Amino acid sequence: MSTSTEIDAPLAAAPAPVGGSRRRGQLSRRLSLLLIAPLILLLGWTFFLPITRLLLTSFTEPVFGFSNYERLWTEPLYLQVFIRTLWIASACTVFALILGYPVAMLMARHGGKFAIFATMCVLIPLWTSVLVRSYAWVIVLERNGLINSWLMARGLISQPLKLLYTNGAVLMAMTHVLLPFMVLPIATALKSVPPDLPKAALNLGASRLRVFWSVTLPLSLPGVFAGCLIVFVMALGFYVTPALLGGPRTLMLATLIGQQAIELLNWPFAGAISLVLLVLSLGITVTFKRLLKLDRVVAHD
């Protein structure tokens, strides 16, 4: 009996062959590369190759050098467009956060039919075309639109206000369009917060405001950072809404690129603006990523 046990023990403890696991790992990696190869080729042919060619054009035409970039930074009109884009994107992110955080808290704290209803209210606008939603704002803000008609009917104004083709119109519409992209990440982060933590803080005598600032908000910061990053980067390159509600007097970087490429056929200058927008978006993404890592380190400590 003891002899059989002594013989079986080394056999049971024998390690699995290493060569077989390595082969399986190599086959798995090769299969993964084979599966994503068509996607890489498609992206390379339809995205990276045209972008690379456009960026090279910005350095080589009309003459080799940085003339297109110097024009972007030296002419007041284009510098104003750059500043306006940053301002509207920042304001849109702030307003989306202020409006979206309470909605995300309601979605995370309430279950059942209310949570389903709130989620549908957030998701349904995403299923509607951005063009349709932007045209809806045109109807609301135009000279004979809903707001001016309501104000004039009550005698609050004597003549229609100029609401359309302004920075405010672009900001309101972009906040409305991008709001779901702020709500969903924050709601996901809030749902991951253990419900016992706020309850424990309340039982220890903390006020609801103190619980929010000390417990709920810090634990939801990953969702806040993710939502702010998505909204800000999308706002930087937004085209449809600024083109419809801003007009030629409220240009942003994306609409300026469209104007230079489609109307003026100035592809080198459009490529220069595109590179600036791309570098700006990548820089902001890297910054938010580092902030998120720092926040996780602080939370862990």
Language-model-detected regions and their locations in the chain:
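Transmembrane-helix boundary motif in ABC transporter permease subunits
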Residues: 91-123, 139, 191, 196-198, ...
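Periplasmic/extracellular loop-to-transmembrane helix junction in inner-membrane transport proteins
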Residues: 29, 33, 56-94, 159-160, ...
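Membrane-interfacial helix termini and adjacent extracytoplasmic/periplasmic loops
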Residues: 21-25, 66, 134-175, 209, ...
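Transmembrane alpha-helices
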Residues: 36-45, 94, 120, 124, ...
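C-terminal transmembrane helix and the adjacent membrane-cytosol boundary/short C-terminal tail
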Residues: 2-18, 187-202, 271-301
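N-terminal signal-anchor/first transmembrane alpha helix
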Residues: 13-53, 116, 120
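Short membrane-interfacial helix/loop motifs at transmembrane-helix boundaries
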Residues: 40-80, 140, 144-145, 150, ...
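Interhelical loop and adjacent transmembrane-helix boundary motif
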Residues: 8, 13, 20-31, 69-78, ...
